[in-house]
Design a protein with these regions (language model features):
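N-terminal edge beta-strand
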Residues: 58-84
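Sec-dependent bacterial lipoprotein signal peptides
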Residues: 1-29
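Structured interaction patches on ligand/partner-binding surfaces of diverse proteins
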Residues: 100-128
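Helix-rich interaction surfaces within compact, conserved domain-sized segments
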Residues: 123-196
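Short beta-strand segments enriched for Tyr within beta-sheet-rich domains
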Residues: 87-91
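Bacterial Sec-dependent N-terminal signal peptides
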Residues: 26-50
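Short, solvent-exposed beta-strand/turn "edge" segments of beta-rich domains on protein surfaces
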Residues: 38-39, 78-85, 151-152
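Short acidic/polar inter-strand loop motif in beta-rich domains
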Residues: 97-105, 167-174
């Protein structure tokens, strides 16, 4: 049987290499990595349903639908909103992503993330229709999936600009204050509006 003998000098050099290797390895792996903050991306919304119910319980649904979701092709559907004059209304909004199969109900996601979403209604002329959100987030701020309002005793035509603002916190500070300022838009649609 052959025996190998390692000289003490060679053993010492090998030991130094091992110690240096372990030292640099521990430095490499002990460095803290910067924590990645998850992004709070905007929702892809291809379909919007506005469900108006008047004081007599008559239901009218008006829709926007753009199934490709990227705006490269014209929307498949963009209804004109037609309401009766001198009438009270409740409004329910449903939104979907139809690029997925089955379609994704984004309304539920907005409810879960209500503290970073708000629907804004801009009516021109303002005398045609008033709308006010009646649902609130955990901070008591409006969401707008459920709203109430009324038309005046005047017929006319105009526009209803529906905006869904996405207002996630910035640097840990809340952006949502109950108005349109801040954040970005998930939806910015201008419906033709007629009050008869």
């Amino acid at each position: 049987m052959q025996q190998y003998c390692i000289s003490p000098q060679l053993n010492m050099i090998s030991m130094k290499k091992v110690v240096l290797f372990l030292f640099f390895t521990s430095l490499f792996f002990s460095c803290k990595k910067e924590e990645v903050v998850p992004t709070d991306d905007n929702e892809l919304i291809t379909t919007v349903e506005l469900i108006f119910t008047d004081a007599n319980k008559k239901v009218s649904t008006f829709s926007f639908q753009d199934k490709d979701g990227d705006g490269k092709t014209p929307p498949e559907k963009f209804d004109k909103i037609v309401l009766d004059k001198n009438m009270s209304y409740s409004l329910e909004i449903n939104v979907y992503d139809e690029t997925k199969n089955p379609k994704a109900n984004i309304t539920e996601q907005i409810k879960l993330e209500s503290d970073v979403h708000i629907f804004v209604f801009k009516i021109d002329p303002a005398s045609l229709l008033s709308l006010k959100a009646i649902d609130k987030d955990k901070n008591g701020l409006p969401i707008g999936l459920l709203s109430s309002g009324s038309t005046q005793n005047v017929a006319g035509a105009g526009k209803l600009n529906l905006i869904l603002k996405h207002q996630p916190p910035v640097n840990g500070k809340a952006v949502k204050t109950g108005n349109e300022a801040g954040g970005s838009s998930d939806i910015d649609l201008v419906f033709d509006l007629s009050v008869k």
